[in-house]
Amino acid sequence: MAIALIFDCGATNLRTIAINEKGQILASHHLANNTKQGIESSDYHIWDIEEIWQKLTSCATQTLNQLMQQGIDLKDIVGISVTTFGVDGAPFDENDQQLYPIISWKCPRTIPVMENLSNQLDIKSLYQRNGIGQYSFNTLFKLHWLKTHKPDVFQKMAKFVFISSMLTQRLTGQFTTDHTMAGTSMMTNLTSGNWDPSILASLGLSNNHFPPMRYAGEKVGKLRTPLAQKWGLNPVPVISCGHDTQFAVFGSGAGLNQPVLSSGTWEILMARTQHAEPRFEFVSQGLTTEFDAQSNCFNPAVQWVGSGVIEWLGKLLFSDVYGSDHYYTTMIKEGEKAFNAGKRAVNFEGIFSQLGQGNISGLSMFATRGEIYVSALQHMANKLKNGLSVLHQVSQFQAKSLICVGGGSKNVLWNQIRANTLNLPIDVVDISESTVLGAAMFTFAGVGIYENVNAAQQAMQPTRKRIYPN
């Protein structure tokens, strides 16, 4: 048996997971993650890398103990990789010392920087080159903030290191840059697949300010001897992974030109394509394009608030069962009754995640809460249809099916409405850890357990349940 040990640094939880070459999770442990208050303002958010590292190493010890309790030989662990949220990182000096804390994606300090971007760069040209939408947490804005507000730090910066690579450096001693993390920064070029010289020049930086790029599946280095001895492991390879989103998509089993919907508080619709055409007219719809986990491929994506709206509605209309074991089943049961009844008058329009931008029409004294609930699900399905149309236009493909993962994929009524609205089959993936599975696929391919990552994906494919339009 071959085992991969995955370190996953999430915004909510820090975890280590041991998974075998068949995609089975053997052991795991997690601890809560949280931001700290910035020094300059109580509104600022930073990540404490020392605390994150201490918690992850503790998780690793617990996970390995679980394996030993099962009688599993720790020498079966053949590789390690790290996944994290995107964009965040920190500056280091020429002596490899961190100069400033990791500014969290939650921090509002970069909002004014984003709002002022048009005074420094051609926004349309920038977007067409790197494909990344204007989000205040983008790495570009963090570096601009450091340059303006911490010029001494910025001047001493010999390299900027993303958080995933800060962790792999502690595992191996080697500084690198995960390609999937670079692709979230707003500083890369979709055509070259590398850093964009003109964007870096606007900061007074060059490629030399970033450690060598590593593609997913490439070797970062070997596990440092002190850690190998501490954990009872061989000095196994540490394999580059990086941004969690890319590995969640790959772990779902998605091939090229296959859209994947991650349905949670936010719904994120992505595809794996060989074509990337960021069109500025779709910026308002949230179109962003990142590097895929595989080289020379891309992940165009659109997003909108999904279950967040449904939960708001549920609390209002189903308050009698909210918080009970019957909450979701009651909503779905009453929704199915309204759905099967056919014609509905209630209609949702607009954006319900913004103040005063959502509208509900067609209400009457005869409308049931089940009908209102179904109409909300239909509204979300319409957003999905519009989002898929955008991906079709910018990536030159026509979807034949849709993969659905995440908490919202467990709602059978919602899935049926999605299938009917798209007139496409929906494949619901039966896995809660698609990010970990995707990272393990690249890890096993990187150490030679599988010939390549496509073979790993095929062998470790999660099970699916297909729902057809009716």
Curated annotation (Swiss-Prot):
Recorded hits in InterPro entries, A to Z, give: ATPase_NBD, Carb_kinase_FGGY, Carb_kinase_FGGY_CS, FGGY_C, FGGY_Carb_Kinase, FGGY_N, Fuculokinase
* Keyword hit for Cytoplasm: no
User: Which PROSITE patterns does its entry note?
Assistant: FGGY_KINASES_1, FGGY_KINASES_2
Q: Write out the catalysed reaction.
A: L-fuculose + ATP = L-fuculose 1-phosphate + ADP + H(+)
Q: Which domain of life is it from?
A: Bacteria
A GO-annotated cellular component: cytosol
Database matches in CDD domains? ASKHA_NBD_FGGY_FK (cd07773)
User: Which cofactor is recorded for it?
Assistant: a divalent metal cation
MF GO annotations: ATP binding; glycerol kinase activity; L-fuculokinase activity
**Which Enzyme Commission numbers does its entry carry?**
2.7.1.51
Recite the UniProt keywords alphabetically.
ATP-binding, Carbohydrate metabolism, Fucose metabolism, Kinase, Nucleotide-binding, Transferase
> Which one GO biological process term can you cite for this protein?
L-fucose catabolic process
* Pathway membership: Carbohydrate degradation; L-fucose degradation; L-lactaldehyde and glycerone phosphate from L-fucose: step 2/3
Q: What does this protein do?
A: Catalyzes the phosphorylation of L-fuculose.
The family line of this record is: Belongs to the FGGY kinase family.
Protein name, entry field: L-fuculokinase
Q: Which gene does this sequence derive from?
A: fucK
